Amino acid sequence: MAATAHGLCEFIDASPSPFHVCATVAGRLLGAGYRELREADRWPDKPGRYFTVRAGSLVAWNAEQSGHTQVPFRIVGAHTDSPNLRVKQHPDRLVAGWHVVALQPYGGVWLHSWLDRDLGISGRLSVRDGTGVSHRLVRIDDPILRVPQLAIHLAEDRKSLTLDPQRHINAVWGVGERVESFVGYVAQRAGVAAADVLAADLMTHDLTPSALIGASVNGTASLLSAPRLDNQASCYAGMEALLAVDVDSASSGFVPVLAIFDHEEVGSASGHGAQSDLLSSVLERIVLAAGGTREDFLRRLTTSMLASADMAHATHPNYPDRHEPSHPIEVNAGPVLKVHPNLRYATDGRTAAAFALACQRAGVPMQRYEHRADLPCGSTIGPLAAARTGIPTVDVGAAQLAMHSARELMGAHDVAAYSAALQAFLSAELSEA
């Protein structure tokens, strides 16, 4: 199935946490004939379509027609996490008769955008299971939490809003007498005894469904409003690109790979983030399973290429002065190639040319993004993955507004174009003279 704006809406609404992103992608892969491999098991030496999951990260590859040890990799990398408000380990508070859940900002969250929203809870419970531990996804889509704004009449300064993340972003969830703890309530909703919960990785999510909005063009809405576009839009586009790659073309000299990592928003320095050994170890095991050696693996990296797929800033109509004037970026105008001389993005001339060629072959326009020199620039998994693996890397994305807000905005028509460009990147022969 080709990537569509409706498909992205369904993907996001099904995936309120990084754990759910991996579960959603895994479900699609299993339905397409992929087989899940556990890292602790011996991997088969038969070429095929496989994926492996490490907590909130996943790597999938299609080596069904490519068993040769020198076939290069074509990789799309993205991240599964988004800035949000997470539940503290001991969250229960009683303040002025209100039952309060203490929350912690995750990543560069735009705090004010989370105020006065109906919030659900999602994440993972680690539960005692006999003599061991099992991990269960949890999702509550009822509006049980809300972070209330201060009334304007009580504000010290009505012209600006300053939020203290320790004092001002805790959520209310009731009044009066309450016997159970918040984690106990979540456990009960998940069908688990509270006493059996050994750990809880819980976070809030906005309950407003993703939506196609704006003026219609040929009967189709032009804009897509949703939470977590950064970076679930890239996870979805990369997943659809991998699934759409023609299997027969895999015998022409490459192995397409999708790698989606947790913890990008907090630096990627975790056991399953982009700074971990996850991608490099999976790639090496693919080579070893095909009968190759570590020498074959190291040689193979030099001919491989990675597209770090993360969302890009569209020029904001209300703040055009915050953007590089000679590099305007529009929504519904094609994928974005991101360049930064100080390597906040991993793109160089070689990889930029490769992605430009992929866009041409996909028949989609491409835009080029440069950040203002007088503003600090964010980064991606691109430089980290490139440094970890040595694989030539290009940073790309789709244009959006309101990045890191609880609710973000992108062009509806960019979804298909973005995925088509990534598919061409995975499937095109990008040889050099």
Swiss-Prot record:
* Name under which the protein is recorded: Probable M18 family aminopeptidase 2
Which residues does the record give as Zn(2+) binding sites? H79, H153, H404
Gene3D superfamilies, alphabetically? Aminopeptidase i, Domain 2, Zn peptidases
EC assignment: 3.4.11.-
Q: Which UniProt keywords are present, listed alphabetically?
A: Aminopeptidase, Hydrolase, Metal-binding, Metalloprotease, Protease, Zinc
Enumerate the cofactors the protein uses.
Answer: Zn(2+)
Name the Gene Ontology molecular function terms of this record: aminopeptidase activity; metallopeptidase activity; zinc ion binding
An example Pfam family from this entry, by short name, is: Peptidase_M18
BP term (GO), one: proteolysis
What cellular component terms from Gene Ontology apply here?
cytoplasm
Say which family it is in.
Belongs to the peptidase M18 family.
